[in-house]
Amino acid sequence: MHTLQVLEKKLGYTFRCKEQLQAALYHSSYANEHRAGGITSNERLEFLGDAVLGFVTAEYLYAKHPDLPEGDLTRIRAALVCEESLHEVAQSLDLGRYLKLGRG
């Protein structure tokens, strides 16, 4: 099975645009070493993904907890999307295995 297919199976999601998935896995160190091949880093997708994750999490919490005040919702969202929480999720999915990193 192709590496991206394995990742999709782990995620429980099939990406329509495999190129976007692949681009999301290019670390800036890899992109710098392969710039001549048209490879760009995942930083722009990371920016967009952070915004989408924040929105989806906020929408979920807003619907799930209609009686919580804004401050509580903000604190819960911050805890869910913080670097430590996302690191735990990434480790549980072994995402590092799929990243393309540079040599240096």
What does each model-identified segment do?
Residues 1-104:
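RNase III-family endoribonuclease catalytic core
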